[in-house]
């Protein structure tokens, strides 16, 4: 266990009471950290900022625990140090680590450039997700036979019970598709996405 991230992406930007909620985030963190330290004084505690882990201006006190790490997220934008300026500036102002807990796929070139920028600025990173059903991940999942029927049912109109019944596929078919999907998710059955892995500066085997 690396540590505990208290809340993932707290306080969306579209809430009408966003300023009021932002003001409550740090006090909530302090109460949670205090409770954790009653049973665990060892592990790091990761604190995500408001508005998709991006707004660190809501934090004013970093001195209440000696094992805090801040965590940011970013999807899209320029692959430059300027794009990360607010994260870097906050990190430097509190003299505590900043960890990019989520960053999403763009092009392989963008991904490689952004990784280099983060590493040059001493920001640890995790690209998200590790595996999914296409090639924008490290490990691709093969789609099983009849998976399209599962998807079609999940996307079908369901305003009434009649619509749900009409869209419902054969249960034996979709059950087998789900079981096959679970097997395909096993790491030994996934497909390494070589270009993606290499763009992260890692060796694909």
Which residues are covered by each model-predicted region?
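Extracellular glycoside hydrolase catalytic/binding regions
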Residues: 1-132, 137-151
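Aromatic-rich peripheral "rim/lid" segments of glycoside hydrolase catalytic domains that contact
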Residues: 110-205
């Amino acid at each position: 266990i690396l540590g505990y991230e208290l809340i993932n992406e707290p306080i969306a930007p579209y809430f009408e009471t966003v300023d009021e909620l932002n003001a409550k985030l740090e006090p909530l963190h302090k109460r949670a950290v205090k409770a954790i330290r009653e049973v665990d004084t060892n592990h790091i505690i990761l604190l995500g900022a408001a508005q998709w882990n991006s707004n660190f201006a809501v934090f004013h006190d970093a001195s209440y625990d000696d094992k805090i790490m801040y965590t940011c997220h970013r999807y899209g934008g320029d692959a430059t140090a300027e794009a990360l300026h607010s994260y870097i500036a906050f990190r430097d102002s509190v003299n505590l680590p900043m960890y990019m807990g989520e960053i999403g796929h763009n092009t392989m070139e963008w991904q490689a450039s952004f990784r280099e920028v983060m590493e040059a600025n001493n920001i640890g990173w995790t690209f998200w997700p590790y595996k999914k059903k296409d090639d924008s991940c490290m490990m691709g999942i093969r789609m099983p036979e009849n998976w399209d029927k599962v998807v079609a049912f999940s996307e079908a109109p369901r305003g009434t019970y009649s619509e749900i019944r009409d869209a419902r596929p054969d249960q034996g078919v979709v059950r087998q598709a789900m079981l096959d999907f679970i097997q395909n998710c096993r790491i030994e059955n996934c497909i390494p996405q070589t270009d993606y892995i290499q763009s992260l500066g890692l060796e694909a085997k």
